[in-house]
């Protein structure tokens, strides 16, 4: 029990075919045409398009370093007509790696109760925290189950991407709604995968720490390399991403064209920030999915591109050195 929260497994928990399936079907089960849903911008695409597919109207809530996200959330509620029915959150964030503390969720739950809004929280990166940071669960807030549900996936913590296994916990009415629509759409997750997942969750947890350390080392190598190349970044304290502001000399290109340039000229694949929302167009997302050697190769490619463009005086390449 990682968070000290007791749940009724029959009424307050349901297995999903990964978080993405659960999120999409939950929105189909609970949203109607014309409902308003609050979604951070930038955000993971299913948080946006799951609601759109269900027929709801999206109200983007700006989530950038220049603003206080909670204040933006309050303002969006005040200015929304009709009143929002649901808000979709995900911390640590994909793509921005933004993190919150438990007090943030306490305020969210209070806000949701005040305005009668459902809260859906995607806790995909629960265990991928660095430098002592531990991601909180919204379920730790007393009374959260009155208004909220939370998704967890085994893809990241247990390196089980592709197995398509996760679960949703929290509000019993939302759990029941998801169970009903899933009874029409699928027959559940393949039983051997569920058995393997139980073993993973209940067995020794050293593997989770190994995965976390692997991502932390990759983060360190990439962050060190980008900073050495003259590309200032905010070093994330969680998730498997680095959300990097496009260097000033390339800002006018926008994230899509800059991502193409990196792919063609540096042989480095990143996700353009525009794919996560309008407010993401000033950034690109690096995913820490390659090993440290490949990350160092990527940094060298970026440095070479900067050299050819004559923009930066790149120091001696130290990306082959270890990170202390």
Residue ranges and their predicted role:
Residues 2, 6-324:
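PLP-dependent class I/II
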């Amino acid at each position: 029990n990682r968070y000290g929260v007791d749940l009724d497994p029959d009424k307050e928990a349901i297995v999903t075919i990964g978080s993405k399936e659960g999120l999409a079907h939950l929105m189909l089960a609970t949203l109607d045409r014309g409902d308003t849903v609050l979604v951070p911008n930038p955000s993971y695409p299913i948080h946006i398009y799951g609601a759109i597919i269900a027929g709801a109207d999206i109200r983007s809530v700006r989530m950038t370093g220049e603003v206080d996200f909670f204040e933006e959330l309050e303002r969006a509620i005040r200015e929304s007509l009709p009143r929002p029915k649901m808000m979709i959150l995900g911390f640590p964030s994909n793509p921005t790696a933004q993190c919150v503390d438990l007090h943030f969720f306490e305020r969210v739950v209070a806000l949701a109760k005040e305005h009668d809004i459902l809260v859906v929280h995607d806790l995909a990166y629960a265990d991928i925290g660095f430098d002592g940071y531990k991601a909180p669960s919204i379920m730790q807030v007393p009374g959260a189950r009155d208004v909220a549900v939370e998704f967890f996936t085994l893809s990241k913590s247990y390196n089980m991407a592709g197995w398509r296994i996760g679960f949703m916990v929290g509000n019993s009415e939302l759990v029941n709604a998801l169970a009903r629509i899933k009874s029409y759409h699928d027959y559940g997750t393949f039983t051997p995968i569920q058995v393997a997942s139980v073993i993973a969750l209940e067995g020794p947890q050293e593997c989770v720490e190994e995965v976390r350390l692997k991502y932390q080392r990759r983060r360190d190598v990439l962050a060190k390399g980008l900073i050495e190349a003259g590309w200032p970044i905010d070093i994330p304290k969680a998730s498997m991403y680095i959300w990097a502001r496009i260097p000033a000399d390339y800002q006018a290109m926008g994230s899509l064209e800059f991502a193409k340039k990196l792919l063609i000229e540096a042989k480095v694949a990143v996700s353009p920030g525009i794919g996560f929302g309008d407010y993401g167009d000033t950034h690109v997302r690096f995913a820490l999915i390659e090993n440290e050697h490949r990350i160092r190769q990527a940094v060298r490619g970026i440095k070479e591109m900067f050299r050819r463009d004559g923009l930066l005086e790149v120091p001696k390449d130290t990306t082959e050195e270890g990170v202390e």
